[in-house]
Amino acid sequence: QTWPPVEGRPSCKRCGACTRMWPPEANRCVCDDIVPQCHEGCSKCEKVDTRSGKPLYQCQSFEYYNCAA
């Protein structure tokens, strides 16, 4: 099993559901961040309705992230 280096992963302030693998670097997570644009490797990018009317998105697929929390 190989996974991308932590340094090259997109950062995520709030990781939601994650797989439970060992070591921790092997885990993929769903990022709960709402962002202006999904990162390049996101395979399921969903538009989020906001009060401001600005188009914002959330990546809803399990991906490799650099999780802050």
Swiss-Prot record:
GO terms for cellular component: extracellular region. Expressed in bulb (at protein level). It comes from the Eukaryota. One of its GO terms (molecular function) is serine-type endopeptidase inhibitor activity. Disulfide bonds join C12-C31, C18-C29, C38-C45, C42-C59. Belongs to the Bowman-Birk serine protease inhibitor family. Serine protease inhibitor. This is Bowman-Birk type proteinase inhibitor A2. It comes from Hyacinthus orientalis (Common hyacinth).
